[in-house]
UniProtKB/Swiss-Prot annotation:
TM regions (residue ranges): 3-23, 40-60, 101-121, 139-159, 160-180, 198-218, 222-242, 261-281, 293-313, 321-341, 350-370, 382-402, 432-452, 472-492, 526-546, 635-655, 665-685
Keywords recorded for this protein, A-Z: Electron transport, Membrane, Mitochondrion, Mitochondrion inner membrane, NAD, Respiratory chain, Translocase, Transmembrane, Transmembrane helix, Transport, Ubiquinone
Lineage, uppermost ranks: Eukaryota, Fungi, Dikarya, Basidiomycota, Agaricomycotina
Superkingdom of source: Eukaryota
Gene name, Swiss-Prot/TrEMBL: ND5
Stated role: Core subunit of the mitochondrial membrane respiratory chain NADH dehydrogenase (Complex I) that is believed to belong to the minimal assembly required for catalysis. Complex I functions in the transfer of electrons from NADH to the respiratory chain. The immediate electron acceptor for the enzyme is believed to be ubiquinone.
GO biological process, one term: electron transport coupled proton transport
Protein name listed in UniProt: NADH-ubiquinone oxidoreductase chain 5
NCBIfam families listed in its UniProt record: NDH_I_L, PRK06590.1
Amino acid sequence: MNLIILFLPFVGAFISGFLGRFVGTTGAQILTCACILTSALLSLYYWLSINELIIGLFSFEGDQVYFTDWNFLSNNTFINLGTWVDSEYIKISWEFTFNEITLPFLFTVLFISFLIHLFSVNYMANDPHIQRFFSYLSLFTFFMAILVTGANYFVLFVGWEGIGVVSYLLINFWFTRIQANKAAILAFNTNRIGDMALSIAYFVMLPAFGSADFSTVFSLPAYINQTTITIIGFLLLVGAMAKSSQIPLHNWLPGSMEGPTPVSALIHAATLVTAGSYLLIRSSPILEYAPTVLLVITIIGASTAFFAATCGLVQNDIKRIIAFSTISQLGYMVMAIGLSQYNVALAHTLFHAYFKALLFLGAGSVIHAFGDIQDVRKMGGLINFLPFTYAVMLVGTLSLLATPFLTGFYSKDLIIELAYGQYSFSGTYAYILGSVTAGLTAFYSFRLISLVFLTKPNGNKQNYLNSHEASITVIIPLAVLAIFSIFFGYVTSDLFVGIGSDFFANTIFIHPNNISLVEAEFSMSLIFKLLPTIFSLAGTLFALYLYNYNPHFIDSLVENNLGKKVYGFLNGKYYFDVIYNNYIISKGLQFGYNISKEIDRGVIELIGPYGMSNVLYSTSANIAKLDTGIITTYALYITLGLLSLLFIVFAPMLVNTTINDEFRLIILFIFTLIVNSAYLNKKLSK
């Protein structure tokens, strides 16, 4: 059953991609959806069965049914498909594991992927390359499953590279668009930085641990030199920064919105961008012995969350607003990892996947219904034309804002509380930025809701006349994701983040000094717990007031000089792209040009074949000049040679203190004769 879960997506991708002309458009859609759905259901069944969650969940007393507790028995299943590398020093196997970390991730990836496949049936109905699109989606899901279930770092790396390549193909699916080409190349090259760091981490890891298997590596960090562990931790962090879009390697994600909207939902909500956080969560035994790395992770995560939230304030593309929201939420996940709260980071990763996929698919429904318009300033009043889409997007937005008792509430607010519960500089820094970010998130989220659905219509009349809710294949994914955005956090929060839950006892390691869940739960003042919620409420009310009742205030705010500078700074994304283009990329290209000009076509020619032939030719020509045919010249050569020989023999006497001065004069006289003879030789040769 395990192999069926893994390889069914590949079967669907292979048949749809290579046999698409035979199975047809409808056949490719049905086949890929069926394969992904089967894998998702099997992964859910396997997750429930190995942890015995089906038994003992409820107790009955009379007519009342009580929820008792999660009753699970830890089980870690390994499947070995054979040896990949077998040498004297290392053995690497094609091995997969199914445990308490991999199965929740696997189910989330497969289930959301199925919903996105189903959504794409209608969304991509008029595209001429449907088979290729569904093949890419299924192939991406397959590689993500490989990444999640790999039992060693090298199998994980296969999935890591696979999703990188397929994400390039998906972002560049409409390859006739120049902007799609640029976005795909940017995403691919930025992720290569992370891939290089991850590769170097493996090269450091192998001699340090002697293995790449998780079971071996995770048992040894306490006995390894801390400098080595810190280096490995930093390299893993760089890899995660590129894949999970953390500053300064964040710039690829907003541009990747050039791909189809289902791609945005699959890659930038549920799967690819969470791969970096999954890598760090999986490597918790290494990071726990590298406190410097944890400090850096916390600062980077908090800074990314705040940075993306401020940039999201001024975006006008509906997909880019949600993209910056994704970067901001990824910052929360990374921040939780830096605080050593890996289970909370994992919970937020899974919870976020549902409501962010809902927001992306809701945006896709709006774009599809409104004539492919993506600028929120050209919309407005769509609540009357797309009431169902408005309802589900409102649910996703409220869950994103950690509204009490919705899915996002059980992880996002807890991350901020845990930051305060650290009682450290990094914890305070994370708490302040996390709380402010919560308010900013509320503002730009309800700015989107207001401009798209609530304000007066600002679009083309024909677009409004043609607007309508999509077919059932769009409504079902939105409805299911909305249900998960409401209830999934409530149902699973005690399992993932509940005090006393040992669900991750055998898969996540937290150093005893870093456990702060009790402090965050019981020692915090109520005001510090409520502060993020207060900021969120303030941001919501402020956005609703400004864009529905006083829209001219924003215009007047931006029209003054300071407002223009701030707006330009935020709209320019802190000028990261300008810095990269002017000071890194252009300088790198110039350096490469100089290398090509001076070395590839200059120095190499001088010291290569051309240079060697020139040296030999000039040397032979100079030697030929010595053959003058004049006897006196030959006599001079003989004299010069003898004098040189005498000088070589007697030269050491110049520094010998036991030799008389008369002998030193004789030696200097011989040297003078050599110089004169050489001078005469030069004159005669002319």
